Amino acid sequence: MTSSLSRPSGRRADELRKVALTRHYTKHAEGSVLVEFGDTKVICTASVAERVPEFLRDRGQGWLTAEYGMLPRATHTRSDREAARGKQTGRTQEIQRLIGRALRAVFDLEALGPRTIHIDCDVIQADGGTRTASITGAFVAAHDAVSKLIAAGKLARSPITDHVAAISVGVYEGVPLLDLDYAEDSRCDTDMNVVMTGAGGFVEVQGTAEGVPFSRAEMNALLDLAQSGIGQLVQLQKDVLGAGHV
């Protein structure tokens, strides 16, 4: 896709920000990744607990769940910690449920066995796309946690069935764009988050017209952009994981 539009970032309409996935970023978690989408930076950890929630007791399967949060000064102005306020915001609950759903879509929970993988995504710097960056990085952290279970003889095979990644797209000044940063996201006419598997299946599509309703043609263009971008992210996941991955 080409366009005469000048994006605030200077990127092409179909160009991702610079994306980096740094594995083994923290010492203690079974899996940990620093994921960077431009100036958005998120630490994703995967921790294993040899137990399942009460609703899964004696069901012979495992579980994967996620939590999401932002450091107080991850954004332009400081926000109080949610723990200090005594409750999570609706946005936080929505995002962490999305992360959990996205990863469970590529897990065989019976093959995981009666254990839980806890995903924690902590935004240390936000410049748009924190939820999509979290999903993309959390997959790699979860993969590394599973690899440790296999190496320890606790799993005979990987319960991971495919890759999963996510990206934001939107209509900005009438032009469909891939991977919105904050300057674009805060001014776009349409904002959409797309989660897909490596095989090309859709896990979730969240799309909202911020002002001007979008057409079917614009929606199709956004989904095409998202599919292309997610394909690049899945390839990056494969590159950083190396041989022997899913």
Swiss-Prot record:
Entry-linked Gene3D superfamilies: GHMP Kinase, N-terminal domain
EC main group: transferase
Entries under SUPFAM superfamilies matching the protein: Ribonuclease PH domain 2-like, Ribosomal protein S5 domain 2-like
InterPro entries linked to this entry: ExoRNase_PH_dom1, ExoRNase_PH_dom2, ExoRNase_PH_dom2_sf, PNPase/RNase_PH_dom_sf, Ribosomal_Su5_D2-typ_SF, RNase_PH, RNase_PH_bac-type, RNase_PH_CS
MF terms (GO), sorted A to Z: 3'-5'-RNA exonuclease activity; tRNA binding; tRNA nucleotidyltransferase activity
UniProt keyword Iron-sulfur present: no
Known catalytic reactions: tRNA(n+1) + phosphate = tRNA(n) + a ribonucleoside 5'-diphosphate
Keywords for this protein: Nucleotidyltransferase, RNA-binding, rRNA processing, Transferase, tRNA processing, tRNA-binding
Gene Ontology biological-process entries: rRNA catabolic process; rRNA processing; tRNA processing
Residues annotated to bind phosphate: R91, G129, T130, R131
Pfam hit, one: RNase_PH_C
Enzyme Commission number, as recorded: 2.7.7.56
Function: Phosphorolytic 3'-5' exoribonuclease that plays an important role in tRNA 3'-end maturation. Removes nucleotide residues following the 3'-CCA terminus of tRNAs; can also add nucleotides to the ends of RNA molecules by using nucleoside diphosphates as substrates, but this may not be physiologically important. Probably plays a role in initiation of 16S rRNA degradation (leading to ribosome degradation) during starvation.
UniProt family annotation: Belongs to the RNase PH family.
Assembly, per entry: Homohexameric ring arranged as a trimer of dimers.
Protein name from the UniProt record: Ribonuclease PH
Native source organism of the sequence: Burkholderia ambifaria (strain MC40-6)
Species classification: Bacteria, Pseudomonadati, Pseudomonadota, Betaproteobacteria, Burkholderiales
Name of the coding gene: rph
